């Protein structure tokens, strides 16, 4: 073990990125103690799609956490921070279970929904409300795509989450 309970506090960080999860340990001064990474696949199917399996994220979190806990005692960890990829679309049911693969920010199949949204609301007004432009990269357009193309999934959707929110 690299730390003991007599050592200064240790902080654990998980970054659920596009290509993998990076878990790190820092001391209270910000010095990096250790880092572990676990990759997961992205399915780049035809039609501008980019999807991931949320179960792969969870496995990566578990694997990297277990690897770091071989180096420090859980009692030494004073705090945990989680960051992750954004602008995706993960539809979950009322029990929090994924209903379909997660659509990543780079999934562009909702370009028609982007156009529809632009016709229904002034893009400047949309920006004033949300702080974002209308784009197939964002979550709302992806959810609109699910509603149109996978109505049975949309009907079961209790929440739409981003990757880190699911974890």
How would you label these PLM feature ranges?
Residues 10, 23-25, 61:
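Hydrophobic packing within well-folded, soluble alpha/beta domains
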Residues 1-7, 11:
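Single conserved hydrophobic/aromatic residue that forms the stacking wall/gate
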Residues 15-19, 82-85:
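A short acidic Gly-Thr/Ser loop motif
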Residues 62-167:
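Glycine-rich phosphate-binding/catalytic subdomain of phosphoryl-transfer
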Residues 4, 18-19, 130:
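Ser/Thr-centric signal marking residues that sit
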Residues 16-54, 97-105:
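Short glycine-rich, Thr/Ser-proximal phosphate-binding strand/loop in the N-terminal lobe
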